[in-house]
C-alpha cells in the first residue's frame, strides 16, 4: 500500500496513537521535501520551545481556583473578565506523548500550579493573605483531547488533499513529479499556516486534581 493511503487509514482510525500518526505524517512530509511542514510536525513530537509560534488549538481555557485550608480548592470569582482571562488562558507546549500520557490518567481535570509571582499578584488583587494563598488553574481533560483530535483531523485532511492532487507514492517513495507538485501546490504547503498563533507560557506536568504542576 502506498504511503498516503497508509496515512489516511491511520488518521481515520478511532483511538489511533496520535504520536505514531504524526511520525507517519512526518515521514510522508520528508519524502515530499516539505521542510516547513516537517519542522511543525517535529515540534508536535518534541514540544514547543519559548519563542515558537504556537497553534491556536494549543490555547486552552481553565478554571481559576484557590486552596482553602478549610475546604480545599474553591473557584475564584473575578469580576474583571479580561483580568481573569489573562490567568486562565494558557498555551500548552508539551509534546504529543506527554499530552497523551496526561489524558490517559483519566481524571476530569488536570491541575496547573501558578508561579510564586502569579500567586502574589492574585493574592494582592483579591486581598488575600499572600503567605497563605495558593492558586491553580484547573484544566478540563477534554481540552487535552481536543488538542490531540485537532492534530488527527489536520493530518487526515492533509492526506486527502494529497490524494486529490494525485500524490500517493509508490511503496515508500514518491516520484520527482509528485515531489514537485507537493512543493508547488498551495493547498499542500500552506498547511504550515494552520500551525500558527501567539506565544504564552505554562506546562501541565501531572494529572490528578490535587497534583502539583509547574508553570
Annotate each language-model stretch with its function:
Residues 51-100:
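Heme-based O2/NO sensor domains and their adjacent alpha-helical segments
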